[in-house]
A protein has these predicted regions:
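Conserved, short, structured surface segments that act as functional micro-motifs
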Residues: 76-84, 89-91, 107-151
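Ser/Thr-centric signal marking residues that sit
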Residues: 28, 56, 95, 123, ...
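Non-catalytic surface loops within mature trypsin-like serine protease
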Residues: 33, 52-54, 86, 101-102, ...
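Zn2+-dependent peptidoglycan hydrolase active-site motif and core
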Residues: 43-46, 60-102, 129-134
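Surface-exposed, glycine-biased beta-strand/turn segments
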Residues: 1-77, 113
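Residue-level recognition of beta-strand microenvironments
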Residues: 30, 69-70, 100-103, 120-123, ...
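Short, surface-exposed secondary-structure edge patches
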Residues: 55-58, 102-109
Protein backbone atom coordinates (compact mmCIF):
# COMPACT_ATOMS: atom_id res chain seq x y z
CA UNK A 1 0.00 0.00 0.00
CA UNK A 2 1.56 3.34 -1.04
CA UNK A 3 0.45 6.83 0.05
CA UNK A 4 2.49 9.97 -0.66
CA UNK A 5 5.53 7.83 -1.55
CA UNK A 6 5.47 5.77 1.67
CA UNK A 7 4.72 2.03 1.53
CA UNK A 8 2.68 0.29 4.24
CA UNK A 9 1.63 -3.29 4.88
CA UNK A 10 -1.59 -3.33 6.88
CA UNK A 11 -3.11 -6.24 8.77
CA UNK A 12 -6.46 -5.94 10.53
CA UNK A 13 -5.98 -7.82 13.78
CA UNK A 14 -9.68 -8.59 14.11
CA UNK A 15 -11.71 -8.37 17.26
CA UNK A 16 -14.13 -5.74 18.43
CA UNK A 17 -13.85 -2.25 16.99
CA UNK A 18 -13.98 0.87 19.15
CA UNK A 19 -17.30 2.76 19.04
CA UNK A 20 -16.66 5.91 16.97
CA UNK A 21 -18.53 8.20 19.39
CA UNK A 22 -19.00 9.02 23.05
CA UNK A 23 -20.69 6.41 25.26
CA UNK A 24 -23.76 8.62 25.64
CA UNK A 25 -24.35 8.59 21.90
CA UNK A 26 -27.14 6.54 20.40
CA UNK A 27 -28.07 4.96 17.04
CA UNK A 28 -30.55 7.26 15.33
CA UNK A 29 -30.77 5.24 12.11
CA UNK A 30 -29.77 1.56 11.76
CA UNK A 31 -28.15 -0.29 8.87
CA UNK A 32 -30.46 -1.57 6.13
CA UNK A 33 -33.65 -0.49 4.42
CA UNK A 34 -35.20 2.75 5.69
CA UNK A 35 -37.26 5.76 4.71
CA UNK A 36 -34.65 8.32 3.65
CA UNK A 37 -35.13 11.37 5.90
CA UNK A 38 -34.37 13.90 3.15
CA UNK A 39 -35.46 12.18 -0.08
CA UNK A 40 -38.61 10.63 1.41
CA UNK A 41 -38.17 7.27 -0.37
CA UNK A 42 -37.24 3.78 0.82
CA UNK A 43 -33.48 3.30 0.33
CA UNK A 44 -30.77 1.08 1.74
CA UNK A 45 -28.78 2.74 4.51
CA UNK A 46 -25.17 1.57 4.11
CA UNK A 47 -24.12 2.33 7.68
CA UNK A 48 -25.43 3.40 11.05
CA UNK A 49 -26.09 6.95 12.22
CA UNK A 50 -25.00 7.74 15.77
CA UNK A 51 -26.38 10.95 17.25
CA UNK A 52 -24.61 13.46 19.43
CA UNK A 53 -23.69 17.13 19.54
CA UNK A 54 -21.73 19.29 17.14
CA UNK A 55 -18.08 19.16 18.14
CA UNK A 56 -18.26 15.78 19.90
CA UNK A 57 -15.12 13.72 19.16
CA UNK A 58 -15.29 10.96 16.55
CA UNK A 59 -12.81 8.13 17.14
CA UNK A 60 -10.95 5.71 14.84
CA UNK A 61 -12.63 2.33 15.26
CA UNK A 62 -9.35 0.44 14.74
CA UNK A 63 -5.71 1.04 13.80
CA UNK A 64 -5.08 2.05 10.19
CA UNK A 65 -4.13 4.70 7.66
CA UNK A 66 -6.24 7.67 6.59
CA UNK A 67 -7.04 7.19 2.88
CA UNK A 68 -9.61 10.01 2.54
CA UNK A 69 -10.13 13.20 4.54
CA UNK A 70 -12.07 15.90 2.69
CA UNK A 71 -15.51 17.28 1.89
CA UNK A 72 -17.49 14.75 -0.17
CA UNK A 73 -20.00 16.26 -2.60
CA UNK A 74 -22.02 13.02 -2.81
CA UNK A 75 -23.92 13.77 0.40
CA UNK A 76 -21.44 12.61 3.04
CA UNK A 77 -20.14 16.13 3.77
CA UNK A 78 -16.85 16.16 5.68
CA UNK A 79 -15.71 12.56 5.55
CA UNK A 80 -12.82 10.36 6.71
CA UNK A 81 -12.00 6.85 5.47
CA UNK A 82 -9.53 4.55 7.21
CA UNK A 83 -7.90 1.48 5.64
CA UNK A 84 -7.39 -1.15 8.34
CA UNK A 85 -5.71 -3.68 6.06
CA UNK A 86 -6.51 -7.32 5.44
CA UNK A 87 -8.10 -9.53 8.07
CA UNK A 88 -7.03 -13.14 8.65
CA UNK A 89 -9.23 -14.29 5.73
CA UNK A 90 -7.60 -11.80 3.33
CA UNK A 91 -10.60 -9.42 3.32
CA UNK A 92 -9.78 -5.70 3.14
CA UNK A 93 -11.47 -3.73 5.95
CA UNK A 94 -12.22 0.00 5.53
CA UNK A 95 -14.28 2.26 7.79
CA UNK A 96 -16.01 5.50 6.79
CA UNK A 97 -17.08 8.39 9.04
CA UNK A 98 -19.30 11.13 7.54
CA UNK A 99 -20.98 14.49 8.25
CA UNK A 100 -18.13 15.80 10.41
CA UNK A 101 -17.97 19.42 11.51
CA UNK A 102 -14.16 19.53 11.47
CA UNK A 103 -11.62 17.09 9.98
CA UNK A 104 -8.60 16.48 12.22
CA UNK A 105 -6.48 14.03 10.20
CA UNK A 106 -4.92 14.09 6.72
CA UNK A 107 -4.46 11.43 4.04
CA UNK A 108 -1.43 9.27 4.81
CA UNK A 109 -1.53 9.70 8.59
CA UNK A 110 -1.54 6.54 10.66
CA UNK A 111 -4.08 6.30 13.46
CA UNK A 112 -4.51 4.05 16.46
CA UNK A 113 -7.83 2.72 17.71
CA UNK A 114 -9.47 5.49 19.75
CA UNK A 115 -7.60 8.42 18.16
CA UNK A 116 -9.85 11.43 17.50
CA UNK A 117 -10.16 11.81 13.71
CA UNK A 118 -12.86 14.48 13.37
CA UNK A 119 -15.52 16.42 15.24
CA UNK A 120 -19.17 15.44 14.88
CA UNK A 121 -21.32 17.72 12.77
CA UNK A 122 -24.12 17.93 10.24
CA UNK A 123 -22.40 18.61 6.90
CA UNK A 124 -23.66 17.18 3.61
CA UNK A 125 -27.11 15.58 3.43
CA UNK A 126 -27.92 15.59 7.13
CA UNK A 127 -30.82 16.52 9.40
CA UNK A 128 -28.79 17.08 12.57
CA UNK A 129 -25.46 16.38 14.29
CA UNK A 130 -24.39 12.76 14.01
CA UNK A 131 -21.73 10.50 12.54
CA UNK A 132 -22.64 8.15 9.70
CA UNK A 133 -20.40 5.10 10.26
CA UNK A 134 -19.77 2.39 7.66
CA UNK A 135 -17.69 -0.79 7.55
CA UNK A 136 -16.72 -2.16 4.16
CA UNK A 137 -15.35 -5.62 3.39
CA UNK A 138 -13.54 -5.63 0.02
CA UNK A 139 -15.59 -2.54 -0.87
CA UNK A 140 -18.98 -4.04 0.06
CA UNK A 141 -21.04 -2.52 2.87
CA UNK A 142 -21.71 -4.70 5.92
CA UNK A 143 -23.61 -3.99 9.14
CA UNK A 144 -21.17 -2.09 11.38
CA UNK A 145 -22.81 -3.52 14.50
CA UNK A 146 -21.20 -6.87 13.58
CA UNK A 147 -17.84 -5.24 14.39
CA UNK A 148 -18.83 -3.18 17.45
CA UNK A 149 -19.23 -4.25 21.06
CA UNK A 150 -22.80 -4.53 22.34
CA UNK A 151 -22.32 -1.65 24.79
Amino acid sequence: YTINGSTYELKYSGGVMFWPTLERSYITSPYGSRLHPIQGVIKNHDGIDIGGSTGDPVYAAADGIIIYSAFNTGGYGNMVMIDHGLNSEGVKIVTLYAHGDKLLKSVGETVKQGDVIMEMGSTGNSTGPHVHFEVRENGSHVDPKNYLSAS
